A protein has these predicted regions:
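Alpha/beta enzyme core
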Residues: 2-202
């Protein structure tokens, strides 16, 4: 059912989002999930016929004219930025398609169960694991794993979202990560092949 308070739009249940996506596939059409960094972007993403809108902190940096990799750096509170874009820009203007919130699952300052409740109460219909540590490798990846900022936190976040009846569309970089995400209830799995390129900066 749509929003029980207004009769239309977000938040949707996990199954409602899945059913919408299955309906798209049944028509032989690809699923399109587009990132929005501003309200005006979200408006035209919806008008263009996308299936999902995803909000992540990197969208804010893109709107500033910077590359999406900024979203992986310590240039701001990734969770707060995504929430702010959703609350003040995107959720107020989107009429009907599901909106997904990027969640930085390894943020040690947040009780993730508590944060996800806030995400859901804000009106988001699902979550995405961004910024993601799955695309970090080498020595720094090892340091993250050793110091409690493991990609396992992202699996756990998706598991919590599943318990809260929230849809999840997730990034992975290996088959093993894909398996773990599915075990935790992920609904859609994206093979992350690198950050955005092209345009003026990427």
């Amino acid at each position: 059912m749509p929003n029980p308070w207004t009769g239309i739009g977000n938040p949707y249940t996990k199954q409602e989002v899945v059913d919408r996506l299955k309906a798209t596939l049944a028509k032989g059409e690809p699923i399109i999930a587009a990132g929005a960094g501003t309200g005006i972007s979200a408006k035209f993403i919806e008008k263009g016929g996308a299936d999902l809108i995803i909000i992540y902190n990197s969208g804010r940096f893109r709107m500033m004219g910077h590359g999406s990799t900024c979203g992986l750096m310590a240039y701001g509170d990734a969770n707060a930025i995504a929430m702010e874009i959703g609350e003040y820009e995107v959720l107020p203007v989107v009429k009907e398609i599901p909106v997904v919130c990027g969640v930085h699952a390894t943020d040690p300052r947040r009780r993730m169960w508590h944060w996800l409740q806030q995400v859901k109460n804000m009106g988001f219909s699902g979550v995405n694991n961004f910024p993601t540590h799955c695309i970090v490798d080498g020595h720094f990846r090892g340091v993250l794993e050793e110091t409690g900022m493991s990609v396992k936190k992202e699996f756990e976040m998706v598991g919590l979202a599943t318990k809260m009846d929230m849809f999840s569309i997730v990034y992975v970089a290996t088959p093993e990560e894909a398996v773990e995400m599915v075990k935790n209830g992920a609904d859609a799995v994206i093979a992350h092949v690198g950050t955005t390129v092209g345009g003026s900066i990427g």
